[in-house]
């Protein structure tokens, strides 16, 4: 496994105002409030874009990342009972080079629910079959991961 190092500079940090902004947005999730905060949001969004690009540079030392996607703040409310117009988090996806590589990475930034995820989101039936076949042939790497005490402490025994 490769270790990724980042420079200790401002583009590897999230501006604390991101969390303040989203706390305020959660309480004021309406177009009028957002319009008055749009310039502030654009500045914060630019900082998160720089953060994401810096993370991509680090990931590129260990993987082949094709693109970075910063998700829009606007929610699609057409088929939702919840009509609040704005997401209350930043979502960043790092897509691996296709078709050679599958899967990717995701960073979720919000006041009380930050997380990093990696893996394969919504695999096609043929990809899912391949994953199952690979585990059937040799599951040792997965067993080694889920057998670590920290994993068991967090997720229990599988």
Predicted regions mapped to residue ranges:
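Short, intrinsically disordered, low-complexity segments enriched in Ser/Thr and Pro
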Residues: 56-74, 131-134, 139-145
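Pyridoxal 5′-phosphate
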Residues: 1-11
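Compact, glycine/acidic-enriched structural inserts
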Residues: 112-158
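Short, hydrophobic/aromatic alpha-helical segments in well-folded domains
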Residues: 20-21, 37-40, 93, 117, ...
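Contiguous, amphipathic alpha-helical segments that mediate oligomerization or scaffolding
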Residues: 17-62
